[in-house]
């Protein structure tokens, strides 16, 4: 009867759970981290190290966090934690953007607009309370993601100190000569009732009317003369324009041509029986005339646009208004007619060219911009014939204007087209350019544009195309409109002269005095402040500005209001946000940083893509393809979410679906099972007593430490360049190939069958200990909860948190002058694969049931055979086969052959050996197992 030898084996044993059960375990860990003050402990432990500052871009304090928030915060957390492990002190101060329209809208829905139920001060207080509640909700979910930071002391743009620092920052911008005021066309949202910054605009398709409108010549003969022709009697001349915004025609003050463009004078459609010639860009004449129903292009003359400069036209429906032909660089012959109707109140290029020609001084503000903040024509807007425009909304006016012009002879063509059009990012509604008095940060008057473009070149951009993207945006952007006509925000805090409109000559000094008061009482102080307190006898000559600052200025000055205020270095080491922030926070921060200090506020800038489903579609409620981070954490755990984020190529769109989550859960199990196997085989191992020195290790153990060292070099370099997908892939490959398919499989025999304290067994345990110590650190930035759990189960002293440690220093490469080098091991592993290929068909045809039932013969050249023959007694352990014989042969190739063994099987180690039964005390054991149980035990040198 077979004796039971199980008690003589050293099988794996660990209390580290096989199942992660993350949704239950993670909250308990969070409670402990909170209770123990983990972030403060980690900072204290890192005191005195070099600083690495990842500055948090503030999410808006409104609504629950979504998957994009989770991606952003987890990427930041991975970097921060990897920096602690790399030997840095990496403070992370989370922040929130708290002012602005979405919060105002939320309060308006509940209490109405200012003045209905609440006065302005009460309204601001409700906004403050609402934002604070939203911060608490978001903070809870951010913590649940496993993100560590100064959650008890975040920065909030609504804090009195921040608001005061923002006013101080604006004063610095003004001191450096960047502030200007003017009546300029700005992006205007009629729903917001306020100007918008570039970053508050998004583009969407819109169906717009298109019209070709003829502007009749005041002196047709003069225009004909510019083309070198004489006009036949009774022939009219007109210049047609093409536009998608008929509502701007009441504000039309000029028609722009391209100075160097070629124009032709062509026969157009008759005007109520009278012949009419048209001035059209030569490249567009055929297309334009086709729109007007004219088949043949009959050309009467050619001229450059410059030849027509300042000749006069008549407005198409305000006959008394002279419309000069002017020259503008913005005119092209790509589409339309080559002539651009110019309304300086409704377009930046129109404004600039009109200013050059002195047109703005000839007209009233109401003529330049005849619409109010709601998008309605002013009462002073003249009618179009019998059609009243005053009080009409511009989006309704398009059709009204077209209908009114149909029988006048000036409407040459009308149609519709779908095109990309600017919309408000909050309301998703079309916006318009509208000339209003605003405060701007000028891109030119103190060289801000040029300085910003230089600063961009000093920054390391991830991905690299980010540099060209933001440079293009800076190069083409208009002045930054920083004023808003709203209630909830930081006041511009300027006093302006009642007659001249000029800021007080001591403006920045006064602003700093206001900031001192705001720091104590918040922004309400500005509205209750008696100007005489600061201005004395001058108070009667000055008004307080009631405009507030653009929220992008709020977040744009965090480098000053947070970093400098908290004693952190500036520029920050890294800004990290979504790819839309090239036109948002990256840009506003860059402009304020350069305006204040002439340097970019960041050394590195990293962007990530947006989340989409497995088909590449944007996640939305309407499609039903959204996946909320809260649901992932509730069902799978935060570590699965973190693993997906780390493994995705975040430089592009990031796909997520239930199937992708399942694959990540499977990958997580592979990592966890590897850790559990390592821990199981470290049972009874104390590194203080049992650690075998690297030079004394069995060859294969020394090799796996060498491989771990190579992997750590790769992983730490990848963390340093933020390539987390490479890290995850390398870890999974190491677990599957180096450990799972090779090392752990081969060493089972030693670990299970050798005497507990045998050097060969302790050597394997030592190698596994080194791997486990390194492994827990490798995964810690990504799998924060699992790493914390694993840390507690490692042998030896492991107090505190894995983030108290740095990258493991117990690994080392194999010496190049060793008797057998890593290259020799690689050749033996290639031989192992060759053996496996030979055994595969033998298993398939039933010649053997397992590799242990096959005896192997390896034939190699004399030099190789001589190198391998000393190992031949142990090669069976590497191959997990029967006995191995190495022979020399006259060949350059290596040949492997195998045959079924006829030797008996040892019931303890399962090896087939001739020595089975040689000891009468253990008739079913091989001599090796008898020695391991009763005697001195076997010796292992190689495998």
Curated annotation (Swiss-Prot):
A motif ('HIGH' region) lies at residues 59-69. It comes from the Bacteria. Its cofactor is Zn(2+). A motif ('KMSKS' region) lies at residues 618-622. GO terms for molecular function: aminoacyl-tRNA deacylase activity; ATP binding; isoleucine-tRNA ligase activity; tRNA binding; zinc ion binding. Zn(2+) binds at residues 906, 909, 926, 929. Its EC number is 6.1.1.5. One of its GO terms (cellular component) is cytosol. GO terms for biological process: isoleucyl-tRNA aminoacylation. It catalyses: tRNA(Ile) + L-isoleucine + ATP = L-isoleucyl-tRNA(Ile) + AMP + diphosphate. PROSITE patterns: AA_TRNA_LIGASE_I. It is found in: Cytoplasm. ATP binds at residue 621. InterPro entries: aa-tRNA-synth_I_CS (IPR001412), aa-tRNA-synth_Ia (IPR002300), Anticodon_Ile_BEm (IPR033708), Ile-tRNA-ligase (IPR002301), Ile-tRNA-ligase_type1 (IPR023585), Ile-tRNA_ligase (IPR050081), M/V/L/I-tRNA-synth_anticd-bd (IPR013155), Rossmann-like_a/b/a_fold (IPR014729). Its main location: cytoplasm. L-isoleucyl-5'-AMP binds at residue 577. Binds 1 zinc ion per subunit. PANTHER family: ISOLEUCINE--TRNA LIGASE, MITOCHONDRIAL, SOLEUCYL-TRNA SYNTHETASE. IleRS has two distinct active sites: one for aminoacylation and one for editing. The misactivated valine is translocated from the active site to the editing site, which sterically excludes the correctly activated isoleucine. The single editing site contains two valyl binding pockets, one specific for each substrate (Val-AMP or Val-tRNA(Ile)). Belongs to the class-I aminoacyl-tRNA synthetase family. IleS type 1 subfamily. Monomer. NCBIfam families: ileS (TIGR00392). This is Isoleucine--tRNA ligase. The gene is ileS.
């Amino acid at each position: 009867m077979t004796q039971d030898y199980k008690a003589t084996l050293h099988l794996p044993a660990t209390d580290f759970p096989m199942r992660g059960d993350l949704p239950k375990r993670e909250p308990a860990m969070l409670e402990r981290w909170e209770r123990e003050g983990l972030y403060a402990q980690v900072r204290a432990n890192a005191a005195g190290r070099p600083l690495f500052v990842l500055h948090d871009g503030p999410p808006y304090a409104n609504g629950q966090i979504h998957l994009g928030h989770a991606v952003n915060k987890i990427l930041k957390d991975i970097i921060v934690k990897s920096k602690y492990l790399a030997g840095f002190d990496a403070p992370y101060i989370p922040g929130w953007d708290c002012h602005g329209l979405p919060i105002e809208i939320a309060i308006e829905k509940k209490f109405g607009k200012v003045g209905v139920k609440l006065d302005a001060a009460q309204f601001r207080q409700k906004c403050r309370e609402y934002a604070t509640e939203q911060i608490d909700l978001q903070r809870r979910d951010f913590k649940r993601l496993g993100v560590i930071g100064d959650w008890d002391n975040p920065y909030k743009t609504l804090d009195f100190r921040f608001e005061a620092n923002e006013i101080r920052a604006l004063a610095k911008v003004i001191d450096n000569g960047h502030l200007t005021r003017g009546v300029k066309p700005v992006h205007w949202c009629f729903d917001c009732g306020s100007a918008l910054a570039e970053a508050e605009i998004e583009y969407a398709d819109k169906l717009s009317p298109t019209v070709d409108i003829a502007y009749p010549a005041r002196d047709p003969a003069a225009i004909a003369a510019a083309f070198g022709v004489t006009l036949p009697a009774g022939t009219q001349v007109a210049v047609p324009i093409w536009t998608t915004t008929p509502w701007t025609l009441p504000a039309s003050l000029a028609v722009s041509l391209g100075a160097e463009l070629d124009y032709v004078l062509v026969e157009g459609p008759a005007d109520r029986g009278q012949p009419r010639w048209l001035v059209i860009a030569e490249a567009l004449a055929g297309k334009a005339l086709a729109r007007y129903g004219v088949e043949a292009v009959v050309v009467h003359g050619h001229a450059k646009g410059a030849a027509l400069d300042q000749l006069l036209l008549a407005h198409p429906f305000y006959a008394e208004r002279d419309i000069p032909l002017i020259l503008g660089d913005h005119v092209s012959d790509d589409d339309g007619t080559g002539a651009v109707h110019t309304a300086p109140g409704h377009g930046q290029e129109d404004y600039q060219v009109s200013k050059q020609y002195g047109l703005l001084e000839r007209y009233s503000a109401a003529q330049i911009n005849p619409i109010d903040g709601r998008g309605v024509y002013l009462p002073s807007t003249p009618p179009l014939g019998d059609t009243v425009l005053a009080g009409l909304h511009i989006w309704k006016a398009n059709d009204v204007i077209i209908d009114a012009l149909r029988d006048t002879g000036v409407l040459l063509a009308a149609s519709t087209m779908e095109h990309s059009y600017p919309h408000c990012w909050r309301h998703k509604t079309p916006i318009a350019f509208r000339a209003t008095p605003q405060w701007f940060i000028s891109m030119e008057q103190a060289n801000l544009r040029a300085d910003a473009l230089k600063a961009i070149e000093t920054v390391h951009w991830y991905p690299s195309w980010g540099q060209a993207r933001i440079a293009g945006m800076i190069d083409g952007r208009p002045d930054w409109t920083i004023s808003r006509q709203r209630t909830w925000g930081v006041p511009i805090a300027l006093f302006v002269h009642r007659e001249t409109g000029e800021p007080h000559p001591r403006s920045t000094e006064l602003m700093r005095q206001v900031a001192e008061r705001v720091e104590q009482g918040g922004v309400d102080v500005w509205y209750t402040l008696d100007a005489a307190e600061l201005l004395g006898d001058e108070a009667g000559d000055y008004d307080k500005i009631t405009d507030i600052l653009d929220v992008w200025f709020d977040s744009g000055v965090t480098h000053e209001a947070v970093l400098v205020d908290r004693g952190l270095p500036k520029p920050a080491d890294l800004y990290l946000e979504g790819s839309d922030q090239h036109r948002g926070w990256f840009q506003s921060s860059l402009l304020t940083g350069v305006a204040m200090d002439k340097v970019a506020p960041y050394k590195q800038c990293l962007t990530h893509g947006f989340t989409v489903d497995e088909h590449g579609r944007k996640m939305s409620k309407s499609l039903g393809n959204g996946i909320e981070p809260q649901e992932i954490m509730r069902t799978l755990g935060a570590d699965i979410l973190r693993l997906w984020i780390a493994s995705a190529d975040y430089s592009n769109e990031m796909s997520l679906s239930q199937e992708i989550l399942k694959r990540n859960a499977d990958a997580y199990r592979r990592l966890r099972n590897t850790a559990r196997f390592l821990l199981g085989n470290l049972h009874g191992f104390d590194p203080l007593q049992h650690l075998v020195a690297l030079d004394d290790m069995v060859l294969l153990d020394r090799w796996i430490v060498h491989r771990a060292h190579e992997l750590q070099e790769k992983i730490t370099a990848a963390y340093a360049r933020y390539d987390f997908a490479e890290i995850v892939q390398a870890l999974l490959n190491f677990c599957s190939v180096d450990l799972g398919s090779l090392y752990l499989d081969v060493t089972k025999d030693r670990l299970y069958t050798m005497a507990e304290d045998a050097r060969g067994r302790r050597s394997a345990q030592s190698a596994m200990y080194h791997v486990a110590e390194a492994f827990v650190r490798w995964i810690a930035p990504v799998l924060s909860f699992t790493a914390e759990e694993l840390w507690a189960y490692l042998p030896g002293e492991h107090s505190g948190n894995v983030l108290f440690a740095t990258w493991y220093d117990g690994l080392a490469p194999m010496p190049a002058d060793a008797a057998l080098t890593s290259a020799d091991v690689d050749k033996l592993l290639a031989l192992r694969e060759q053996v496996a290929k030979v055994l595969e068909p033998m298993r398939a045809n039933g010649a053997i049931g397992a590799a242990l039932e096959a005896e192997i013969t390896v034939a190699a050249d004399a030099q190789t055979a001589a190198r391998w023959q000393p190992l031949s007694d142990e090669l069976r352990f590497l191959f997990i086969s029967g006995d191995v014989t190495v022979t020399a042969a006259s060949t350059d190739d290596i040949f492997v052959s195998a045959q079924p063994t006829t030797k008996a099987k040892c019931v303890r180690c399962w090896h087939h050996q001739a020595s089975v039964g040689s000891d009468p005390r253990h008739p079913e054991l091989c001599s090796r197992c008898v020695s391991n149980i009763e005697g001195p035990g076997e010796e292992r040198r190689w495998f």
